[in-house]
Amino acid sequence: MDNPMLLKSTTRHVRIFAGEIDRDGDLVPSQQVLTLDIDPDNEFNWNEDALQKVYRKFDELVEASSGADLTDYNLRRVGSDLEHYLRSLLQLGEISYNLSARVTNYSMGVPQVAIDDKQVS
């Protein structure tokens, strides 16, 4: 295959490309390497632990689909599952919205505010 097509999955917070970055910074299609871009618009505040959880989940999802053909559909399924995982991290408070982001649109739901029952009359 002289000019392979670049397969990709793009959601609001997850971009997966079937390819790798070369020395010139160009994305080169590949059937062997997946490149993951998490939260490209910096909508969330991240810590290293949360990022590592996402990378481990990504590896787990890719491993679970090993043996299947690398298709747009299969790649989008991994991306969609990873997007749902990010939502769960947000709901658990492991990541939070970045209020200094270019756009604050609460795409995964309005932030929850804890209410102290003792102060409610």
From Swiss-Prot:
GO terms for cellular component: plasma membrane-derived thylakoid membrane. Keywords: Membrane, NAD, NADP, Plastoquinone, Quinone, Thylakoid, Translocase, Transport. It is a peripheral membrane protein. Its EC number is 7.1.1.-. InterPro entries: NdhM. Pfam families: NdhM (PF10664). It is found in: Cellular thylakoid membrane. GO terms for molecular function: oxidoreductase activity, acting on NAD(P)H, quinone or similar compound as acceptor; quinone binding. It catalyses: a plastoquinone + NADH + (n+1) H(+)(in) = a plastoquinol + NAD(+) + n H(+)(out); a plastoquinone + NADPH + (n+1) H(+)(in) = a plastoquinol + NADP(+) + n H(+)(out). The keyword Membrane applies. NDH-1 shuttles electrons from an unknown electron donor, via FMN and iron-sulfur (Fe-S) centers, to quinones in the respiratory and/or the photosynthetic chain. The immediate electron acceptor for the enzyme in this species is believed to be plastoquinone. Couples the redox reaction to proton translocation, and thus conserves the redox energy in a proton gradient. Cyanobacterial NDH-1 also plays a role in inorganic carbon-concentration. NDH-1 can be composed of about 15 different subunits; different subcomplexes with different compositions have been identified which probably have different functions. PANTHER family: NAD(P)H-QUINONE OXIDOREDUCTASE SUBUNIT M, CHLOROPLASTIC (PTHR36900:SF1). HAMAP family: NDH1_NDH1M. Belongs to the complex I NdhM subunit family. This is NAD(P)H-quinone oxidoreductase subunit M. The gene is ndhM.
